[in-house]
A protein has these predicted regions:
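Conserved catalytic region of serine esterases and O-acyltransferases that act on ester linkages
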Residues: 2-33, 248-347
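Serine-esterase "nucleophile elbow" of acetyl-processing enzymes
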Residues: 29, 33-108
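Structural beta-sheet core signal
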Residues: 68, 137, 172-173
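Surface-exposed cleft-lining segments at the edges of enzyme active sites
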Residues: 76, 106-114, 141-151, 189-193
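Oxyanion-hole/transition-state-stabilizing segment in secreted/luminal serine hydrolases
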Residues: 115-154
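A short helix->loop->beta-strand "cap" motif at the edges of active sites that frequently abuts
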Residues: 167-169
Length: 347
């Protein structure tokens, strides 16, 4: 399964399993404790960013349809304004690059693990307005903190990517973030949390790429920057990103989102000076888990392209235009409530 969870030996020798199950259990319990310590009680509902972006680009072409799936990071937990959420940042960035409106819908659920992707994908595919052009998935942190078996986690993600790709959507996965950056987690537990996160991220890369998706590594991108600037890049709960933190993640993912739709000016030409190359997918996944903002895209099996796309500054924070104000009926909705019983209303 996902090359035996990307063979933990790729991260400095030896699998996490060799360290001992008791130690792994201890670090994951410590992360759970850290979440309780920094969360400050029940987290507020993330602002809804559903709607249309780039209305100034309206023309004869239909708007691009973009959906974000995943957990609290995808939902934008920790910020107060819709325009600061990763979905809004990515949708406005897509609109600016494509010079075309983007209809955005977010089905992510705070607290979700990879086994919730089945429900989220079903919501996406049941939309009467049709299959989205592009889906992005940000998932994995809760799988680690709740000790979901990595094989199950990767299987759920792979199935989600396959269903979306079969339906005709492009898919980009932002892999598991670096849990070693949570401030109340101290050494040596911080080191082990980072190790487990990277191992899952590498396995997610293999699973997603083998199903026709692309991945962008978030762990090593956010890790050093969050560690160096925790007050700026973490939100008030010291667990979820701040607006600046979400912007950092969005800047890393936007080039790959655009490239998946043929919108990015760079081709898939490999630049050796940027440490790009064609590698076996397992090796590409291992490198991506260690290198900031690395994209991995499937090539001819068992090979994959490893790229470091140049980033652009994101547009200024943009609030969405509700769909009822655009004169269109997109069939999109906003989620209210938590858990599998969450309901939807028209946007």
């Amino acid at each position: 399964m996902a090359r035996r969870i990307a063979a933990g030996a790729a991260y400095g020798g030896g699998s996490v399993g060799l360290i001992g199950a008791a130690t792994v259990g201890l670090v994951l319990a410590e992360v759970q404790l850290a979440k309780r310590l920094v969360g400050g009680g029940k987290a507020p509902v993330p602002p809804s960013a559903d709607g249309r972006y780039g209305v100034a680009f309206a023309g004869p072409a239909d708007p691009l349809r973009f959906v974000l799936l995943g957990d609290s990071t995808a939902a934008g937990q920790g910020v107060r304004r819709a325009g600061q959420t990763p979905g809004a940042l990515l949708a406005s960035g897509l609109a600016a690059v494509a010079e075309r409106p983007v209809d955005f819908r977010n089905v992510a659920l705070p607290g979700a693990r990879s086994d919730d992707l089945e429900r989220q994908v079903s919501l996406v595919l049941a939309d009467p307005s049709g299959t989205p052009d592009l889906c992005a998935i940000m998932i994995g942190a809760n799988d680690v903190t709740h000790r979901m078996p990595a094989t199950q986690s990767v299987r759920c993600l792979s199935t989600a990517v396959r269903r979306l790709r079969t339906a005709g959507a492009e898919v980009v996965v932002g892999t598991c973030p670096d849990l070693g950056t949570i401030e109340p987690v101290y050494q040596p537990l911080r080191w082990l949390a980072r190790r487990v996160s990277r191992q899952l991220a590498a396995a997610q890369t293999i699973g997603a790429v083998e199903q026709g998706g692309r991945t962008v590594s978030l762990g090593d991108l956010l890790g050093p920057e969050f560690e160096a600037n925790p007050r700026e890049l973490f939100g008030p709960d010291n667990y979820h990103p701040s607006a600046e933190g979400y912007a950092t993640a969005a800047m890393a993912m936007l080039p790959t989102l655009c490239a998946s739709l043929g919108l990015w000016p760079e081709s898939d030409h490999l630049d050796g000076s940027r440490r790009e190359g064609m590698l076996p997918v397992a090796k590409a996944a291992s490198r991506a888990a260690r290198e900031a903002g690395t994209e991995v895209t499937g090539a001819r099996a068992p090979w994959a392209l490893l790229k470091h796309r140049r980033r652009r500054r994101l547009p200024a924070h943009t609030e969405p235009v509700p769909h009822e104000d655009t004169g269109t009926d997109s069939g999109q909705g906003r989620m209210r409530g938590h858990g599998s019983g969450a309901t939807w209303r028209r946007a």
